[in-house]
Amino acid sequence: MKITPDDIRHVAKLARLDIAETDINAFVSQIGEILDYVDTLNQVATENVEPMAHAISLTNAFREDTVREAGPVEKILNNAPAAADNMFCVPKIIE
C-alpha cells in the first residue's frame, strides 16, 4: 500500500495532530516502512498456531489473603507528603 502526503495530512486531521509541512515526507517514509513490515507479518503462516495470550507460558503465584495489623498510623502517615485527621491528603483531580 502506497502512502501519500495527503494520506498523512488526512490521518493527522482525524487525530487532531498538528504536523509541520516539513515533516510530512518523513512520516510518509516511516509509515510506509511500518505498513511494509505489517505486510511481511501477514505473509507468515499462522493457520496451525494455537492462539495465546503470552509468548511464553506464565503461571500466577497466588497466596491466601490474610488480615493483619498495618502498623502504627502515625508512622505510616509520616511517609505521606500530606496528612490530616489520620488520612492521606491528595490533590483534587476531578472538578
From Swiss-Prot:
GO BP annotations listed: glutaminyl-tRNAGln biosynthesis via transamidation; regulation of translational fidelity; translation
Alphabetized GO MF terms: asparaginyl-tRNA synthase (glutamine-hydrolyzing) activity; ATP binding; glutaminyl-tRNA synthase (glutamine-hydrolyzing) activity
Record's keyword terms, sorted: ATP-binding, Ligase, Nucleotide-binding, Protein biosynthesis
EC number(s) stated in the UniProt entry for this protein: 6.3.5.-
Signal peptide: none
Enzyme class: ligase
One matching Pfam family: GatC
Catalytic activity, reaction form: L-glutamyl-tRNA(Gln) + L-glutamine + ATP + H2O = L-glutaminyl-tRNA(Gln) + L-glutamate + ADP + phosphate + H(+); L-aspartyl-tRNA(Asn) + L-glutamine + ATP + H2O = L-asparaginyl-tRNA(Asn) + L-glutamate + ADP + phosphate + 2 H(+)
InterPro entries tied to this protein: Asp/Glu-ADT_sf_sub_c, GatC
NCBIfam families: gatC (TIGR00135)
UniProt-listed HAMAP family: GatC
Family: Belongs to the GatC family.
Complex formation: Heterotrimer of A, B and C subunits.
Record's function text: Allows the formation of correctly charged Asn-tRNA(Asn) or Gln-tRNA(Gln) through the transamidation of misacylated Asp-tRNA(Asn) or Glu-tRNA(Gln) in organisms which lack either or both of asparaginyl-tRNA or glutaminyl-tRNA synthetases. The reaction takes place in the presence of glutamine and ATP through an activated phospho-Asp-tRNA(Asn) or phospho-Glu-tRNA(Gln).
Protein name, entry field: Aspartyl/glutamyl-tRNA(Asn/Gln) amidotransferase subunit C
Organism: Desulfosudis oleivorans (strain DSM 6200 / JCM 39069 / Hxd3)
Lineage: Bacteria, Pseudomonadati, Thermodesulfobacteriota, Desulfobacteria, Desulfobacterales
Gene: gatC
